[in-house]
Amino acid sequence: FIAGLHHQDIVWTTEFMFNALRARYTEQSLYKYYLHNTSVSRLNRQGNKNLNYQRHYIKITRLLEKLNRNYADKITIYPEFHQQITYEALRVCHAVRKEPDIITRQRMIAEIFTSGMYKRLITNVRSVKVGYQALLWSFRLWQWRDKTRSHHRITRSAFNLR
C-alpha cells in the first residue's frame, strides 16, 4: 500500500485482478462498507482540502496507467481497465465543477493539465458514451482555465514554489 493515499482499494483491486488466475462473479456480498457521518468519503470539501483530496484521484489515474503498462505484456488488458482510468479522471472533473472557490478551481484545472491527467482522460476512452463525456470535459476545462498564466505557473503557486 502507498502511505497516505485515499481509496487504495481502487489500485489494489485492479492489481489483484491482474494477478488472479481465475475470476468469477458472485451475487454474495463478501464485505460491507460502513459509511458513517465522519467518513473520509462523505466529507464536504472546499478550497485547499478539496484540492488535496483530488490529488489522490490524480495519483490513482497515474498508478492505474502504470499498472496497465506493466502488465500489458503478461495479460490481456481489457477495455474496462483503460476505461477505469477515464472514470477516475472524470471524478476530478466533476469536483472542479462543484468547487465554489475560483482560485482553487484554477489550481485544480492547472494540476489536471500539469500532471498529465488530461491526456490520460482522453487516451483511455474505450466507448462512445465515455468518449463524449471526456471530450465534453476536456473542452470545458480548456475554456475554464486561467488564460492569463500558464498552467505550470498556477501549479507552482498551488505548491507555494517560486
Which residues fall in each region the model found?
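Amphipathic alpha-helical repeat scaffolds of TPR domains
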Residues: 80-94
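Active-site catalytic microenvironments for nucleophilic, acid-base chemistry
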Residues: 19, 67, 81, 95
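Short, charged, amphipathic alpha-helical segments
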Residues: 76-83, 106-107
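Catalytic core of nucleotide-sugar-dependent glycosyltransferases
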Residues: 30-37, 43-72, 91, 98-118
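Alpha-helical structural elements of signaling/regulatory helical domains
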Residues: 21, 25, 73-74, 100-101
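Conserved nucleotide-sugar donor-binding catalytic segment
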Residues: 1-46
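Membrane-interface aromatic/basic loop that binds lipid-linked glycans or pyrophosphate carriers
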Residues: 95-162
